[in-house]
Regions:
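Hydrophobic alpha-helical membrane segments
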Residues: 75-83, 200-204, 221-236
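Cytoplasmic-side transmembrane-helix entry/capping segments in multi-pass membrane proteins
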Residues: 65-78, 133-142, 191-200, 224, ...
């Protein structure tokens, strides 16, 4: 039997997941397990589970120990967030666009995003085993994908009527996982990764609680959270090295932007926005 190379495996896996994505759109699993939600949350769980298993195959089963979390879980989280966003868009937000057209458009975006995710995971896995020139590019790609996943998750959490406690727990858990997976790519101890991930997770969840009470649109809440997350994760990744003055200026500028967003775009009673 001819050996299938990694690039071909990624193509096959991405296509299979996209086909499954299109297939599950034909079913409503809420009829099996009654859930009082406007969208079907079972589909993203199915897709993310399959993504986790297929990632193991893509990497030729060369995954052991901690990488079952740091490597295999990353595409699963990516697929979950993207498929959940697509599910919500398809069933409601953009229904005027035409459901068939939106499904096909979502499938194309899904394929591209998943393909890039698996390529990134493969580079990170190989760079863990040995030093390769693409290692830095893989880490940069993962950072960008993490920001996209986090923003999608923050937006979905605040744009849906979710009980505050569940919202806080979800934000804490996902932020912890995303930070831990990202910090795994640099050479720090497991204890340092856990502490940094927990600190950032608690900070983001506390900010989530505050913003839940702030009179601002869910889109801007997600933007504020992702800016804070970007600063925190950036500092955590650079903590081993000297952080240049230029980077500190960037982070301070983002913090100023956050305060501007919070005060100028908030809806203050009958007067509305300050702008």
């Amino acid at each position: 039997m001819p050996k299938i190379n990694t690039r071909t495996r990624i193509m096959i896996t991405t296509s299979l997941l996209t086909f499954l994505f299109l297939l599950v759109q034909q079913y409503d699993f809420r009829t099996i397990w009654p859930i009082n939600l406007s969208f079907d949350p079972i589909k993203p769980f199915i897709l993310s589970f399959v993504a986790y298993i297929l990632c193991y195959w893509v990497l030729h089963f060369k995954v052991t120990g901690e990488r079952y979390v740091t490597i295999l879980l990353f595409p699963a989280i990516s697929v979950f967030a993207l498929s959940l966003l697509s599910e919500i868009l398809i069933v409601g937000i953009l229904s005027d666009f035409g459901q068939l057209g939106l499904v096909l458009l979502s499938a194309i975006v899904f394929w591209v995003f998943v393909y890039i995710t698996y390529l990134t995971v493969n580079v990170l896995n190989v760079s863990y085993l040995r030093e390769i020139p693409l290692g830095q590019a893989g880490r940069a790609s993962q950072f960008i994908l993490t920001m996209i996943i986090a923003y999608i998750s923050f937006f979905l959490v605040f744009s849906n009527d979710i009980f505050l406690v569940f919202r806080e727990l979800f934000i804490l858990f996902e932020t912890f996982l995303l930070v831990y997976i990202t910090l795994w790519t640099i050479k720090i101890s497991k204890r340092q990764r856990i502490i940094a991930s927990l600190n950032i997770g608690v900070l983001i969840s506390l900010l989530t609680f505050i913003l839940s009470l702030w009179p601002i649109n869910s889109t801007y809440i997600a933007l504020v959270l992702i800016l804070v997350f970007y600063v925190c994760l950036g500092i955590a990744l650079e903590i081993r090295e000297f952080i240049s003055q230029f980077i500190w200026v960037e982070y301070v500028s983002l913090l100023v932007l956050i305060f501007v967003i919070l005060f100028l775009l908030a809806e203050w009673g009958i007067n509305g926005h300050l702008l």
